[in-house]
Amino acid sequence: MPLLDSFKVDHTKMPAPAVRLAKVMKTPKGDDISVFDLRFCVPNKDIMSEKGTHTLEHLFAGFMREHLNSNAVEIIDISPMGCRTGFYMSLIGTPDEKSVVKAWENSMQDVLKVKSQEDIPELNIYQCGSCKLHSLDEAKQIAQKVLNSGIGVMNNAELKLENL
């Protein structure tokens, strides 16, 4: 089985919160697809809570689209990592990391402004597969931690695992 790109970087050296351009690929028609690692927690040191991560999944995708989408960039998907240390963001286009950082910061500010559980999008039995697995308070704690820590930019060359 081929080794996935996410397993070719040294997780013991990853800072968090931080952005990493994980890969850029071309579609058959020549469009760029970029995949970003949005690392909220230092791997193997901390994880996001299950309910907080799920609530962030509902909020973060919309807020990031508001702050990052443009004529040159369109977010395809933002999904939580199984290890609960971050999210992967796939998009059409090639925004620079500073633009992604700014959009992430603004999105975390937006999370803090959400007033109640009722304001979480798609939080119902028809649109969510685990609609009781949410916590706005935990999502706000994650957002505040990101903002307090500041978001950095990872360097792929420094994270590359040798001998792969």
Swiss-Prot record:
Any idea which positions bind Fe cation?
54, 58, 128
Q: Name one GO biological process term.
A: quorum sensing
Q: EC top class, in one word?
A: lyase
GO terms for MF: iron ion binding; S-ribosylhomocysteine lyase activity
Q: How is the cofactor bound?
A: Binds 1 Fe cation per subunit.
Keyword tRNA processing on this protein? no
Q: Which Pfam families match?
A: LuxS (PF02664)
Q: Gene3D superfamilies from the entry?
A: S-ribosylhomocysteinase (LuxS)
Assigned EC number? 4.4.1.21
Catalyses which reaction? S-(5-deoxy-D-ribos-5-yl)-L-homocysteine = (S)-4,5-dihydroxypentane-2,3-dione + L-homocysteine
Identify the keywords attached in UniProt to this record, alphabetized.
Autoinducer synthesis, Iron, Lyase, Metal-binding, Quorum sensing
UniProt KW Metal-binding keyword: yes
Q: Which cofactor does it need?
A: Fe cation
Task: Kindly state the subunit structure of this protein.
Answer: Homodimer.
Functionally, this protein is described as follows:
Involved in the synthesis of autoinducer 2 (AI-2) which is secreted by bacteria and is used to communicate both the cell density and the metabolic potential of the environment. The regulation of gene expression in response to changes in cell density is called quorum sensing. Catalyzes the transformation of S-ribosylhomocysteine (RHC) to homocysteine (HC) and 4,5-dihydroxy-2,3-pentadione (DPD).
Write out the similarity annotation. Belongs to the LuxS family.
NCBIfam families cross-referenced by the UniProt entry: PRK02260.1-2
| Name the record gives this protein | S-ribosylhomocysteine lyase
Q: What is the lineage of its organism?
A: Bacteria, Pseudomonadati, Campylobacterota, Epsilonproteobacteria, Campylobacterales
